[in-house]
Amino acid sequence: MMANQQATTPKHYSAYATLLDSFQSYLDAEKTYYKYFTSENPSVTVDEWCDKMYVDLINKINRVPFTSEAADRGTAFNELVDALVKKPLAKRAKDNDMESENIMLRVVVLQLKGRRKTDPITEKAAYEVVFDPDKDNRDRTASQPDEEKPQLREPQTFTFFKDVVDEFVTYYDGALPQVFVKGSLETHFGTIDLYGYADELMPFSCHDIKTTKNYHAGNFKEHWQHIVYPFCLHQMGVPVDLFEYNITNFKETFSEVYAFKEERDIPKLRDICERFIQFIETNRDVITDTKVFHSLNDR
């Protein structure tokens, strides 16, 4: 009897929205390869590329620390926007309050050279941001002897054109930054909890900030945040259907807008979740961080 009860115990899984994005990238690895590796002698083979995408996905599931200047730059931009949405620059300057979360900020004037030697130098206002992702650990261990301190990353300094940042801040006037959303979806294999942090939540729309070196229209069409977050918000009693990716290459801004429709999007969401569950069950032996095999409440 006990064995039968154990066999029929329903399974419960969990995944955050951008993990589904990584899973989608893994599924699309071969298609992506033939889209971008178009030279006669590509630097990697299609098999090597697919293997890399597999390793990247497993590392993300296992929460292996990953750092890159591009990722840090994007995080610093996001935190800067959040800081100025919560408390405008004028008030920060008046209160001498130029720190927030992991950043310190100030306004500077950049001198920009033209493309040609004969072009005049122009001036442009910018935010200078010192980004310290290990700030909390640094503060907490400041009094410890050097030999006992953990190895911490050095702070990095980034500059962002003020007009670009201010466009985001103005657009998000009145928004709630970094809102945690969650919801549960029934699948053929059990329940899966979906969750994540919405960058900016407005009364009638949900927004995610994306930074990229190069942007092409529809870049985020295959991502899952524009389905997961409205799905979760609906379950939380917040009937927001409109989702925007607000994108910058640090010089210009772009938007992709999506409207959530339950009858169309929930079956798609269920399908990707069931494929994800099959993947993690098949690869259970290499998954060391087992959070994906448990509900949000059972961690």
Q: Residue ranges of each PLM-predicted region?
A:
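Conserved catalytic cores of phosphodiester-cleaving nucleases, focusing on short active-site segments
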Residues: 77-78, 198-215, 229
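Coil-to-beta-strand transition motifs
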Residues: 191-195, 202-204, 238, 251-253
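Hydrophobic/aromatic-lined pockets within catalytic cores
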Residues: 81, 85-89, 211-215, 234-238
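Metal-dependent nuclease catalytic cores that hydrolyze phosphodiester bonds in DNA/RNA
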Residues: 1-197
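An active-site-proximal "capping" alpha-helix that borders the catalytic cofactor pocket
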Residues: 223-234
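Metal-dependent nuclease catalytic regions and adjoining charged, substrate-binding loops involved
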Residues: 234-299
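Short, structured patches in soluble enzyme cores that scaffold and shape functional sites
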Residues: 179-181, 210-211, 247
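Active-site-adjacent loop/helix micro-motif of nuclease/hydrolase catalytic cores
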Residues: 215-222
